[in-house]
Amino acid sequence: MYNEHLDGNNEVHELYVIKRSGKRVVFAKEKIEKAIAKANAEEGIIRNRLSSDEISSIAEQIYKSASNAGRDYSVEEIQDMVEDALMDTGKHSVARLYIKYRANHAERRKLTAVDKKIVSIIDLQNEEVKQENSNKNPVVTSVQRDYMAGEWSRYFTNEYLLPEDIARAHQEGIIHFHDSDYFAQKEHNCDLINLEDMLQNGTAISGTYIDPPKSFSTACTVTSQIVAQVASSQYGGQTFTLSHLAPFVDVSRQKIRKRLKTSLSEVGIVFTDDQLAGLAEKELIQEVKSGCQTIQYQLITLQSTNGQAPFVTTFMYLHEVPEGQLREDLALIIKTMFEQRILGVKNKEGIYVTPAFPKLIYVLQDDNIHEGDKYYYLTELAAKCTAKRMVPDYISEKKMFELKGEVYPCMGCRSFLTPDRFTDAGIGNIARSHNYDESKHKYYGRFNQGVVTINLVDAACSSGKNFDKFWDIMNERLELCHRALRCRHERLLGTLSDVAPILWQDGALARLKPGEVIDPLLYNGYSTISLGYAGLAECVYYMTGESHTSPDGRAFAIKVMQSLNDACTKWKLAENIDYSVYGTPLESTTYKFAKCLQKRFGMIPNVTDHNYITNSYHICVREDINAFDKLSKEAEFQPLSPGGCISYVEVPNMQNNIPAVIALLKHIYNTIVYAELNTKSDYCECCGFDGEIQIVEDTSGKLVWECPNCGNRDQTKMHVTRRTCGYIGTQFWNQGRTAEIRDRKLHL
């Protein structure tokens, strides 16, 4: 909507407005003049009409005000400025008619808002939706269908399902009610799949019974089918463990030995047991390779009903199975998975690139982290894989035992279950799984009910740096989040097991009967529900003037985090629901929060003056700090984020410096529960460049991706892989997240 303004260097920049569709367009003063003129021309006005010069003056006044702010404005903000300017002139009749004119248009827009958004999705004109999820391609028909359904669900959620104050707080960026595009239906967030029960005891997929697999390769195929079905029945991520596949390696081993023994005997070949075992092992290795390849390719080529490949994590933990042949078989699977991921997968041009899924998590433990350890060779492979493909991520067995008393994976990206308390309480097998063992704690088959996030930056800025006021605001906002979380919980109450048989009846999460409700699984700590938080870095900086890496900043940050945990403990004790604190992985919402903050508080240096805010407890991406210090300092916050946390360090190309990667892994093992290394893995299809594709500004100030070798800016002709939050994105990002990616400083 603007023309141009001068920055501090007297350089001319065009000013822009963000339309309701999310599209960024040049601001035109004549649109303001035209809207005011319509109100001014109404028959009801006899006196107090505005002259054409006065109308032009108002438009110029708004232009100057917007110019001085140095940021983009939304259409609604511009209209607010017009109303204020009209009232300031004393021409109240014109102002009232303009407000009425605006309200009438708003009502007409309201009646067709969903229709317009759906049309903009189909026509590929909705910038917000196009960059909402970095693993969804908005051009594809099936993805568009999911987005269309999501727009209706958002509307229905805001208008009918949520209390007005919660919906308004969400729209204003005070809190974030996650996944409202799925809230119309009774779906949960993320989970740990009880693959062992399904594979060992049989399951059903789309009404067809599946017997326990008779080979490793079949088990891999069935696993891929289960993952796809689960992904279509929930909106969050899922995790399965390779430990549940490991027993089928020996099933294949015995099957191969039996077949070879028969075949060799039939042709009269004499052989020893060792020779037979050697031949069988060679064939078995090929089957393991084939099975792992099946999982890799099926999981990135299958598409769930939510318009993307399943958001799935594969867990690799050697101590999850007993010592002996079973552990050796698990090690073989892990080794094979690493080798195949290092190779990558071919894109349609036949070039090996980095796949987004499955995300891999490898546990660092006392027999794989030191040179000379029995399984050190796997950690070396993991380091090479990280340097090339940005996975696996790492959990420290040592630190997780200290924090939770056990080792188990996160659900998808970073959401962790609370330690099992229902087994200790003697509540028993409420999910009726066929592999329940009352002598062990249970994690696979449990899930998360959903997330609501508090914007810590807004709470801080709303206080005006008054600490007493800050804590009052925090208490109010936390109770708002609590009520929003209750909405999530109550939405799931009464859900029939029939809505998702793969989850509730056939073993992924439970084996309930048709017609039964899932209500018992929502209490007693079987599932969790998450209080998310974002912007701790900016919150602390605003209130203290320091980073939370400083002693004073850290002390205040710890108090903020403790207040979140205290709230969750209070709610949990009162309701018998496991509320937990979750470090929110804002993706597109980081841009929304930033824009809402700028609208409410203007540009505050190092607080609201960027188009993103910092995820969870993370140190600001613009802060200079080395990798080891970053991990050490952030490790202090992970115990205060028990429902979800992950830390990362940004590193250059490490493929020729694996010892440095190993050094970081050793530091992770000794220091922090859960961490990852971010590298770059890009490819330009125009010139074949393999390296880091750059983020640059185009002539309008928009951030775009450019090949440093040939200058290609066509996103359809490049493969860019970046860590979005806790997972890898490959479909590009909105302007806020892109700016955050650009600003990330290297830590090595």
Where are these regions (language model features)?
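Contiguous, well-ordered alpha-helical segments that form the cores/surfaces of helical PPI scaffolds
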Residues: 529-542, 562, 723
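Conserved catalytic cores of very large enzyme subunits
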Residues: 104-525, 546, 550-709, 713, ...
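Short connector loops/turns at beta-strand edges and beta->alpha or beta->beta junctions
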Residues: 37, 41, 457-461, 541-542
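Long insertion/accessory domains within large nucleic-acid-processing enzymes
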Residues: 709-748
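Metallocofactor- and cofactor-centric catalytic cores in central/energy metabolism, strongly enriched
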Residues: 288-289, 296, 542, 737-743
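Charged, amphipathic alpha-helical regulatory modules used
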Residues: 2-122, 742-747
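Conformational switch/transducer regions in large eukaryotic molecular machines and scaffolds
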Residues: 28, 702, 724-727
